[in-house]
């Protein structure tokens, strides 16, 4: 588990504030303080608190380590008398296809933003597998070209931003520019 944790932390450019040995020692102490026995342990390491909400990694931020225990049932001996069953359904994996839902799950956006920052940019424009513009890491996108304002159509890949809607309403009310919501291609 700790090896997988460190692999995941490395994948998001986050360094654990503790060695594996120190984490293991802390987790064992937590289990002891909670009476031992059949306990599960939940461990989470975050980048840490910051006073400014931003998509780029905050500087000078200390990672937060959070852990708790919870009771788990006795392990089954494998016999049919103690084995338990459950039902399951199958669904397409849509975990990364829900950009239109406002949530705190910003990992994809944050990782894209860090790539932009590392390349000296302030934002990143994101394209789907059809080379159509979706949005930027931290905002919706508008392109002004030849007296028209282009913005991608809303779909499951785009968060319907409040500012996006207000910009469209203001442009319609106060300008004679054409507003086109349509696919915007990379070329």
Where are these regions (language model features)?
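Conserved catalytic-core subdomain
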Residues: 133, 138-187
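Conserved alpha/beta cores of soluble small-molecule-handling proteins
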Residues: 1-125, 129-132, 169-187
């Amino acid at each position: 588990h700790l090896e997988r944790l460190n692999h995941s932390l490395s994948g998001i450019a986050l360094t654990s504030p503790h060695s594996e040995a120190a984490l293991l020692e802390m987790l064992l102490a937590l289990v002891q303080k909670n009476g031992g026995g059949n306990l599960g342990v939940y461990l989470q390491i975050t980048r840490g608190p910051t006073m400014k909400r931003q998509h780029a990694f905050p500087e000078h931020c200390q990672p937060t380590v959070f852990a708790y225990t919870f009771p788990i049932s006795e392990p089954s001996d494998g016999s049919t008398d103690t084995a338990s069953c459950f039902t399951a359904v199958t669904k397409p994996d849509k975990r990364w296809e829900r950009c239109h839902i406002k949530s705190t799950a910003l990992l994809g956006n944050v990782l894209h933003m860090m790539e932009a920052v590392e390349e000296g940019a302030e934002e990143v424009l994101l394209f789907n597998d059809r080379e159509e513009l979706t949005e930027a890491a931290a905002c919706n996108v508008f392109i002004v070209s030849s007296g028209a304002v282009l913005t991608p159509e809303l779909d499951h890949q785009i968060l319907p931003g409040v500012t996006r809607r207000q910009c469209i309403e203001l442009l319609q009310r106060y300008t004679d520019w054409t507003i086109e919501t349509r696919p915007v291609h990379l070329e």
